[in-house]
Amino acid sequence: MPFDVPSGVGRITIETEYTGQSERTVVDFGLIDHADKLVGWSGGNKKTFTLSEFDATPSYSPRGISPGIWHLLIGVPNIRPDSTSLLKAKIYFSKSADPIDEPGVLRTVINSRTQWYRGDLHAHSGHSDGTCASAHHKLMVPCPTYKVIEKARERKLDFLALTEHNTGSQANSLRELQPFFDDILLLSGRELTSFYGHANAIGLVQNIDFQANSAQDGWNSQLISVSNSVFVSVNHPVRPGGEFCMGCAWLGGFPNPAVQGIEIANGDDMGTRYSGLDFWEKLLELGHKLTAVAGSDNHNPDKDWYDWSTLGRPSNWVLAEDLSQSAIIKSLRQGHVVLDFSKDESRIHQPPIEMIAKVGDQVAQIGDSRLVPLGQTIDLEITTSDNYPRRLFLHSNEAMNIQYPNGRGLSPGEKIIIKIKMPNESSWIWAEIRDEKKNVLALTNPIYFTLK
């Protein structure tokens, strides 16, 4: 069955259905490209399949989508002499290979409930520099994607982003493995790596010409080219560069229209001079609304839970309308994120700290912005679900006069309400909990208040 592929197509998806299966009718499918070459053959095994330059449904080979006449290959190995079958094929053209442009038939929803979901936004497999022990522990090898995902499931993560350095080759593995791993969302991603800094692009599949990153203007233009469809966060912004960590220091500057987030903790560097917390807070004070995130930057899934940069620690709790790629990316961009630095392996249902603000009949979640008249009362509600006594700290700009003793103890499961008057300028508040040794265990993103 011929069909005409226009120019500018980044992905082809074919959805088929046919009648007569109760009478043992079988229809097989395959695909032939514009050059009359076989792209793949799935027989009667798959009724929906997709391909792009970077990934394809198993049975099909990834390839660039050239314009011209393609053919849906149809075989009928069995149909009874007196039977008829109605065949319908829907063909979808996407402008790019990225998930944001995929048709709904490809959308994976692991959980349809609106709730907090926990995951790791920075990890590597053998598609870049991730390694692990071989099957018989004879040597270290590029780590297979499935092994990283298995460890993420073992750690009870709801989602995992594999962010490989300047390559998207893992996309084909994720396309194959996502149906099997039906209780964890696999996010496509890239660690865009240059001598001017590293940045994660969550939701990116298409190639980015990292050679353009050899100049700073090229680096920024590459970030801007993808920023509308993905979540871009600066990685380890104050990490030293040079031989210590090539290109790790952020030199991209701010304001930067391509960036929506800052990785304020990479591995276990929260509380060290390499943490990006102060870097992020200074940007808040300058008026930049950027989501704080964290990432393990794991390069070996075999690491013990208490090792540096072990998979799933630190983690990000994301309040999303469902557990799908589009919903997680949307919530990351909106700042609905709590960062968890604790070493509590049992925490799988809710973040250690939650915060909402009530302004009249309006309720603001973490990451939300609200217009508030001068002098209006804001009720700030903070709840901890931790199993141990903790200390609460609140942070805001100088205009927000919060009558609260920072470091006050919180009992397990305690909820407190703090009343605040809207000051004469726009403000924000974020919260953190620490242990008795003042180690940061969790922190929220801000709620923003704009003077009405």
Description of each model-found segment:
Residues 10-13, 61-84, 425-430:
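Noncatalytic modules at the cell exterior or secretory-pathway interfaces
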Residues 18-57, 400-402:
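Surface-exposed beta-strand/loop patches in noncatalytic accessory domains
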